[in-house]
Amino acid sequence: MKRVFTAAFLLSVCLGFINLTGQEAKPAITTEDYTKWQNLGSAAISDNGKWISWGIRYVDGDDSLYIKNTDTGKVFGYAFSSTVSFSSDSKWASMRIGYSEKETEKMTEQKKPVRFKTRLLNLADGTEKIFENVESFYFTRDASHLIMSGYVGDKRTRDLFLCHLSSGRVKNLGNISESAVNKAGNRLAYIISAEDKKGNGVELLNLADYSVTFLDNDTALYRSLVWEREGNALAFMKEYKDTAYTEANYKLFTVRNISTKPDIRAFSPAGSQAIPEKMRISEAYRPVWSKDMKTLFFGVYTWTPKPVKAKSGTSAADAKLPGLDIWHWKDDPIQPRQKITYNTDNNFTYLFAWNIDQNSVIRLTDEELTRGMITGDGKHVIAMNESLYRPAFREELYDFYIVNTLTGEKKLLLEKFPMISGTSPEGRYAIYFKEKNWWLYDIYKGQHINMTAQVPTIFWNTRDDSPKEVKPPFGTSGWLKDDKGFLANDEYDVWRIPTDGTKAVRLTAGKETGTIYRITRLDFEDNFIDPLKDMYFSAFGDIDKKSGYYRIPVKGKASMLVYDDKSITNLAKAKNTDQFIFRSETYSESPNLFLTGYAFTSPVKVTETNRQQAEYAWGRSELVHYKNVHGQDLQGALFYPSNYEPGKKYPMIVYIYEIRSNMLHRYTTPSVRSSYNTTNFTSQGYFVYQPDIVYRENNPGLSAVECVVPSVEAVIKTGMIDEKKIGLMGHSWGAYQTAFIITQTELFSAAVAGAPLINMISMYNEIYWNSGSPNQNIFETSQGRLREPWWDIMEEYMANSPMFQARNINTPLLVAFGTNDGAVDWHQGIEMFTTMRRLEKPYIMLVYDGENHSLAKKENQLDYTKKVNEFFNHHLLGTEPQEWITSGKKYIEKRREEDKVKK
C-alpha cells in the first residue's frame, strides 16, 4: 500500500536532522506553568478606527479587557471585565465589570446573586464612572446616552439609568418593566409597572430634551414594546382580564407618525369576529411590523376557561393524579420530546395580521397550516403543514403555502418538500433547493424558476457523506440589494445569480487553485449585500490549509488581501474609515490581532499574547498527505513534541473525529481542564496526530479503520514514532471510532474514549435525551451513516459495533461518561463494561455523577484531564501506574473521602 507525503513534509523531516549545536534546550512547560497562558477573546474596532478592544481570558478563568489607541499606542487595561462597546462617535467605551472566578464560585456556593457593574470610559482623558448593579447596557445610536438596565427586583421591575454622555448627568427611571430605543437613538419608549398599578402606562421620552409623550396609561399591565425596523413606529400590548378565563388577553396598540403628531390606533379582541371564540391574543408572540408600517403581525392561542371547583364531598385522594406518562406508538413527537418542547408548545400561537388602516384582521395560520414565515415586505406569509407526513423517521417533509396577508388567500407553493431556505429582503421571492439546483418562486407572478440549471458548476454538497435522500447544498451567502440577485456557493467559489434572467457570474476563482471562498459580511446593518460596496471573502486553502481574505472592489481589480500559512480569521472593519483588524495564529504562534489599512500592505501587530512562550520549548505542526485503503487522498495534522530531537523516536497520541486536518494552524492553549489538549501532550514529549476520516455508507466504523490505520502507518514510516507507544483517543463520535478501531487492529497500545457509542443496535433504539428525540434519524440520515434500520441491515450494525467485536480487543481502554449524558446514554458504557469484564479484558470506566455529554464541573474537568494523562503516561511512557489504574477504587473508600471533605 502506497503512502504519500508532500515534498515539503519530507524536506522538513530531513532538515530536522540539522543540529543547532551550542544552543541550550528550553524547558518544556509543566502543569504549574499553565496558569501563565491566555486565550485571546473577541475583539472590536471603533467606528473611526482609532480604538481597538480585545478580551483576554486566562487559563484560571479570569477575564481581562484591553482598549488600545491605534495612533498613540496608549492602552487601557481592566481586570475581570468584558463585553465592551464603543459609542458611534468613538469618544466613549462601556464594559461589564465582573469578578474573579474564585469570587464567582464563592458567591454561587453561598447562593448570593452575582450582580455586575458597568464602567463608562472617556477615551479622550481616561476618566471613568462606575455604575453598580447593571445587568445590561448600550449606547444610543446618536452617541448621546449610555442606557443601563438594573436588575429585576421583587416587583418584577427594574431601574433604568440614562447617562447623558456630554454632561455626565444621570436620569433615573423607576418601576420600568420594559424599554426600547428607536434606531436613530433619539427616543426611548418604556413601560411603567407601578406597585399600586395607578401609574402604569407606556411613555415616550425625547432624549434631546427629556420631554415625555404619554401614549397610554391605565391600571392594567403593558408589555411587548416593538419598534418598526427604522424606528418610525411603535407597537405594544395592554393586558385585560376576563374572570371566566385563566390567562390574560391583550389589546394591541400602534403608534405611527412618531416625530410629528403621534397617530395611535388600537385593536381589541373583545367582541371581534376576527378572533375565534375562546381564543386570545397571546403575550408569547412579540408583534412584528411590516416594512410599510401598514400591518402588525401578532399571535393568538387558546383561552383556557377557569377550572370548575370540585363538588363538595370529593376527597383529596380522588383529586390526585397518578404520576404517569403514557408512551403511545402513535405519539408524534414522542413523550421525551414533548417534555423538552413543553414551554414552546405551551406558548404556541397562530399568526394573525392586523391591517391597521382598514382595521381588519386576517388569520394566516391555523390547525392545518401551523407555522408561518413573514416575507420581507410583509405582504405574504409562507405557511407550512407539518402533520401530513409524520411521523418522519428520516427527513421531515412539509407542504408549503403562500398566504396573502391582506386577503388570507392561500396558494400551494411546494408539496412534500423538506425546506424553504428563506425569502428575499423585498419580499418578492422565496428560495429553495430542488433537484440539485437553486430555485426561486416569484410570489408576484406565481412562477417557479430554476435559477442555476445553466450554471456550469455543482451546487449540491458533494462532501456530505451522510445517507440523506437529497443532498443539501453548499449554501447561499445572501441577497443583493433590491432583490436583484443572490449569492450561491459551490465547492470552492461564490456565484452571483441575477433574478432578471441574465447570466450568472462566478465572482471568485477558487476551483483552479483549490481555494474555498465564502462571503464575509462586515456590515450587518442591512439585510442585503450592496453590489455598489466592496465585497469581502474568506479564503481557505483546501490542500495547503493557508487562509486569508479576498476583496472585490467596486472599482479596480479584485485581489487577495492577506493569505498565509496561518489561520487568519475574524476580519472586522471600522464603520467610517478603511481600518481593518483580523486575527492570526498558527499552532506555534499565539493568536494576535493585526491592524491594517485599505491596501493591507503592512499589517501592524496590535496584541502580544503569551509572550512567556518564548521561554519554553514548543512544538510545531505539519501537514501529512496519505491515501486510505480505497486510494482516496486524505490529510492529517501532525504536531511535534516540544524539544523534538531528530533521530529520536517518540510516542504518539492520535486524536480522531471526522475532518481534523483543518486544525493544522489552530493554537492550543495548555489547560489542566482540557482532557484532549494537544499542547498538554506535546509538552510531555508526545507527537499528536489528527487524521481525516471519510465514510462509506453503512460502514462508519470500518471506514474509520480504513482511514486511520494507513494514516498512522504513514507517519510511522518517517522513523520519528515509536510504533509500540501509540495511543488513540476521541470524544463522542470520535470515541465510538476509537472503541471500534481497537477491535480491528493492535496498532495502538492504549485508548481513551469519552462517551462512546458501543452497541449500534441499542443506540439506534435509544433517546437523544438532550433533545428528547429518537436516535433513529441520526443513524439513517446523519452522522451514524447507517441508511436503514437495524432489522434490515443487522449484519452492518453488528459489524460496526465495538461491543460485538469486543473479543478482538487487546488494547487497554479507558472510557468516561456522565450519568446525565443526554447525547450518548451512559448505559452504552455499561454494556461494554459488562462485556469486557466477562471477557476478562482491560477496561476502566470513569463515571461522573450528574454530568452531561461534556464535563461542566471544574473538579471533574481537572480529574478527567489528570486521569487521561496518567493512563497514557503509564501505557505509553512506562510510568508507574496509579492505584485507580491497577485496581480502581472501592465505593466505601469514595464515601470516606467525601465525608472527610464535608468535615
Q: Where do the language-model regions lie?
A:
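Hydrophobic alpha-helical scaffolding
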Residues: 283-286, 341, 484, 539, ...
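Active-site-proximal cap/loop segments of hydrolase catalytic domains
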Residues: 668-903
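Bacterial Sec-dependent N-terminal signal peptides
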Residues: 1-25
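Active-site lining segments that contact anionic ligands and/or coordinate catalytic metals
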Residues: 284, 293, 378, 435, ...
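Cap/lid segment of the alpha/beta-hydrolase catalytic domain
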Residues: 454-467, 600, 608-725, 729-732, ...
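Short strand->helix junction
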Residues: 153, 195, 241-243, 643, ...
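Beta-propeller folds
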Residues: 12, 22-579, 585-591, 595-596, ...
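Glycine-rich His-Gly loop
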Residues: 386, 540, 585, 655-659, ...
